[in-house]
Amino acid sequence: MSLIRLNIDSFRNIQLAQLSPSSGINLIYGQNGSGKTSILEAIYFLGMGRSFRSHLSQRVINNEQDKLTLFATLNLPRGDSKIGLRRFRSGETEVKIDGEKVKRLSTLAETLPIQVITPESFSLLFEGPKSRRQFIDWGAFHSDPQFYAAWVNVRRVLKQRNQLLRNNSSYDQIQYWDREFVRYTEQVTEIRNRYVDSLNELLKGIIGEFLPQVDVKVSFTRGWDSKTDFAQLLESQYPRDLATGHTVSGPHKADLRLRVGSLPAQDAMSRGQLKLLVCALRIAQGKLLKQQIDKHSIYLVDDLPSELDAQHRQLLLKQLVDTGAQVFVTAIEPAAIVDSLHMPPSRMFHVEQGRVTVIE
């Protein structure tokens, strides 16, 4: 799977651009503020309906316009597919896939699986369990068609349960929701656990390539003691939940634990090693997707030269090439990427003040 055409209209400082990317390595270079990262952001927006840089999606709309438009043609095994997205400053979003209106943004994510390696993505190991849970759920969503519905129901029931707790409801009033919570939690937890087990099998070899001297252990924690029955736990913790006004334990507290010996990885490894670990996680996740559903991710790699030294840039790019996936990578100077590849990039684009030029 790859993008074979990308149209960008009124996205940040890009007024209008049309790209015909290669299915291999696409190098996008230009000075800071030129708009090169905006191209990656536009691809991500098309696949996720939001930015990887700002939670306020209206900010990505060009200041002089009231809407942005993104359009892409995807090359898929079954033939080409067309995706279009329009976001208005009011917050309204219109999405079409092959001319048909799409109501759920999750359909975009399913159609266009994207992996991001940016300076911000290294927060995976530092910002607490939420980002690591999102990492697991990305894989669970793509690997099991039952996951999304169960995950939506967990969130719905948890919201209702927390509202009842804030209303000082009796346990009799909460019991019905607890039965629902347990049912959907079991589904979500089983899929998450199965996914992490599969990821681990791939991850060991990839971590060995990036960090041969470091023994990293990866494990899944479900959000409560695995030896405790979840239904009994909810009942026994009801007084505590009532006092705090929210559900203390459950799938919303799940985490991906990464340890070196007895220490968390972030305490045992240097910042450079942690960056390599995140790269290994992203590579493994993309490879597992290909194994499980025979679909490639699209990799967006931003500002690589500032994040990794020449040796590790070369290693990461080799791993990315080996996945067979389409890759978009940015740099200020093209030589920093070209010199790290065994062969020239399949396609190069220069960006200056929001204008994109193909370099032949």
Swiss-Prot record:
One of its GO terms (cellular component) is cytoplasm. Gene3D superfamilies: P-loop containing nucleotide triphosphate hydrolases, RecF/RecN/SMC, N-terminal domain. Keywords: ATP-binding, Cytoplasm, DNA damage, DNA repair, DNA replication, DNA-binding, Nucleotide-binding, SOS response. GO terms for molecular function: ATP binding; single-stranded DNA binding. InterPro entries: DNA-binding_RecF, DNA-binding_RecF_CS, P-loop_NTPase, RecF/RecN/SMC_N, RecF_2. One of its GO terms (biological process) is DNA synthesis involved in DNA repair. ATP binds at G30, Q31, N32, G33, S34, G35, K36, T37. The keyword ATP-binding applies. Pfam families: SMC_N (PF02463). It is found in: Cytoplasm. The RecF protein is involved in DNA metabolism; it is required for DNA replication and normal SOS inducibility. RecF binds preferentially to single-stranded, linear DNA. It also seems to bind ATP. Belongs to the RecF family. HAMAP family: RecF (MF_00365). NCBIfam families: recf. PANTHER family: DNA REPLICATION AND REPAIR PROTEIN RECF (PTHR32182:SF0). This is DNA replication and repair protein RecF. It comes from Shewanella sp. (strain ANA-3). The lineage of its organism: Bacteria, Pseudomonadati, Pseudomonadota, Gammaproteobacteria, Alteromonadales.
